[in-house]
Amino acid sequence: MSAGVTLPLFVLPMVLLPGEIQQLRIFEPRYRQMLDDCLLDGKSFGLVCDDNEETFNGWNGPKSFGCEAEIIHHETMGSNHFVEIIGTRKFKIKEVIEPALPPFSDQSMEELMPEVGIYPDLDTILEKIPEDKEYHKLYLAADVDFIEEENEISEVQLEELTSALKSVIKSIGNNINVDQEILDEWVDSRIEMIIKKDEDTLYSIAAMTISGLEQKYEILSKSDSDEIYDEIMTNLTKIV
């Protein structure tokens, strides 16, 4: 693992994989503050699947493994922020830094929510932070170690992945009534977009074919390419 750093955390019922592109809508004050900090400093954040079994100052905590997210596009529409992100490096959390304030559902925060669903402005919220707090952010952060990995796969594994993926994509093509005369060409064009001989090939396949949180998290938490390959093949076999 590489030297540890501190990352802001976006905690969601979601798993991001390296090389995967996702869109997020940001409207909560804590994440609007986080987005401002990231955009101002040109920094990334960590996207981590939430863990309902552990809380930090009333907020759901993160699972142990996450993925660094780089912001590649941002736009604002009213009070909502829309960002496009790409997963970069996997990391393991060493220590969570709890947010300065609890959720609005906490009794101490009730005065800030006169109407359900209407958030107060950020300055008003920040005034509630106790002076003795060392950490003055509304969002969780964590000290993390980035996971160094070389996801090299053999030619045999690549061929097996390609064959299994072709079967899945061909099944999709049949289900959406792609013309049989161009079906093979349609399948091959999609294979070319997904399978590349680089370190993100395994994650590209996983991002396209695996939607279950538990399955994606299993892949995120593994550092051995053979284990990741086996997990993907198991899921591809189930789809076919």
Q: What name fits each language-model region?
A:
Residues 1-240:
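N-terminal low-complexity, acidic/polar interaction/targeting segments
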